[in-house]
């Protein structure tokens, strides 16, 4: 699949819907497709080509929020493809993997797996974009510099060197320079994915898959135990700054602007939700109880707000796009955070 077809496929992505009897007297709702977000940036000056992936693990907030901040920037130099929410279902659920660990599905995945289309789209993005490097962003447990079993605050490599990729050399550059600006210091973790026996599972992960397909890749980890989301985002942006130096990437205004304005650039606003209930529109911007007659058909027509906004039914399979129900609460979320809710009751 070429890049044009990849982008087309991403917009046509569909998700499963359960089957119900036609004479069901309950309410019926149809939700929008979950977006597979991708943003391509190109500077006027030639530089490197970098692919940024966030959100493979849905409860790693600092990672996907930092990736998301890059979307609003323009490039002065180089090229970049940003996929900030690669596992949006898990982000909305605020769990590592709603359908299992997506970062163990790159070696092989069943077509029946709800993550299948997203994993395949990520693979196609990598192969069609042909980046100089892929950076997979995560928030890991603990502090690797203090605990050999921890992953937080680290640059993760699969080998010291893989083919002609000097992974340790580049990781060392990032570690040494980023540590000048971080209170909690970074370690380098070498999983020895292809030569060792401890982390064989990494062959199934994104970076291992990339290397096997001759694409250089690193994983960068902030710590889940940092005191705030601000600190996690800060850690990621400081690490990215060093990668950008190596790969000749320059942002208009500089990445330091993002680092200095993390809170200002992450202010949430309540989105406007437009429903269609039996053909009649209902616009909502705050919590409300809606009473509707039996057999009513409800459709979420639009969600107008920020990236990461979505309508999330409470206690319902998040892979479903449409279903029947009697009484249900719908959380209006930005990523993991509920901004308000809509209660719909059958009368």
Show which residues each predicted segment covers.
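Structured catalytic-domain cores with a bias toward divalent-metal coordination
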Residues: 3, 7-8, 22-347
